């Protein structure tokens, strides 16, 4: 580490992320921060100029803060919204949700949302065994963070609950049970899946 401290490990995974290539636009009149700043319609500060994907700086779905979330699913969603708005159909983008899915060795890993909250009002639920690790971060009765290592099969359910900001109180006790699935969700929630 910078401090000179050493941390022994069998494996270290380091990722530096993505930095949008936007320097060439700085004198264009388009508002640039870390990326091209866009509104909820993916429109830049210059009327009729839209941005999406790795160069777009959007609102974070959960915090509302501006950020660049350079991942394929968000690029697709942003591109759709930008395209609809360019064609005259008014559609707003709900915000970006950071997430990753990787395989390290033979272990699958999915993380999404706010996985290491600094807010004391968050509840963290962890269920683990020798092969699997599952962590949910809950705030105000909604999932705001997910980490699954090993068995990631149903992680999409949790990520969609988070994306839709659906309260989990009605099925809270079953959240990390092995047989948890769509059947455990209230009927009115299932339309979101």
Map each language-model feature to its residues.
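Extended hydrophobic-aromatic, low-complexity segments
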Residues: 26, 120-121, 158
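Short acidic-glycine loop/turn motifs at beta-strand connectors
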Residues: 2-3, 40, 138-142
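Secondary-structure transition/turn motif
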Residues: 1-5, 149
């Amino acid at each position: 580490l910078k401090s000179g401290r050493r941390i022994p490990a069998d494996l270290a995974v380091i990722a530096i992320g993505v930095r949008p290539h936007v320097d060439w636009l700085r004198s264009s009149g388009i508002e640039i921060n870390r990326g091209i700043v866009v509104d909820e319609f993916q429109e830049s500060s210059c009327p009729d100029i839209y941005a999406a994907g790795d160069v777009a700086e959007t609102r974070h779905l959960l915090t509302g803060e501006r950020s660049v979330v350079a991942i394929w699913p968000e690029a697709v969603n942003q591109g759709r919204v930008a395209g609809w708005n360019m064609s005259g159909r008014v559609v707003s983008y709900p915000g970006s949700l950071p997430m990753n899915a990787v395989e390290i060795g033979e272990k699958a890993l999915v993380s999404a949302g706010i996985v290491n909250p600094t807010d004391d009002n968050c509840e963290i639920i962890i269920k683990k065994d020798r092969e699997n690790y599952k962590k949910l971060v809950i705030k105000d009765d909604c999932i705001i963070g997910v980490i699954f290592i090993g068995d990631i099969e149903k992680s999409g359910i949790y990520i969609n609950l988070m994306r839709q900001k659906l309260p989990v109180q009605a099925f809270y006790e079953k959240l990390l049970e092995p047989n948890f699935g769509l059947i455990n969700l209230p009927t009115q929630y299932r339309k979101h899946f």
